[in-house]
Amino acid sequence: MQTVLFALLRFYKIAVSPMLGNRCRFYPSCSDYAREAIQYHGAARGTYLAARRLCRCHPFSAGGIDLVPPPTPKKR
């Protein structure tokens, strides 16, 4: 599943993003944030974190530095 999501993000960065320009108000960009979130947290939680980030990325947002939260250790 991660491979499919990474392929979709790569397609977006290569084909769609150049047409839209640099509009993200955050660092790292939303697509980079999504890639890191999926890489560190897995497909389900990473997609959830990326969707939350996309909801915060709008013209009325102050933006700024918003790093992917570190993975929490699993309870045993």
UniProtKB/Swiss-Prot annotation:
Keywords: Cell inner membrane, Cell membrane, Membrane. InterPro entries: Membr_insert_effic_factor_YidD. One of its GO terms (cellular component) is plasma membrane. It is a peripheral membrane protein. It is found in: Cell inner membrane. The keyword Cell membrane applies. Disulfide bonds: none annotated. The keyword Cell membrane applies. It comes from the Bacteria. SMART domains: Haemolytic. Pfam families: YidD. Could be involved in insertion of integral membrane proteins into the membrane. Belongs to the UPF0161 family. This is Putative membrane protein insertion efficiency factor.
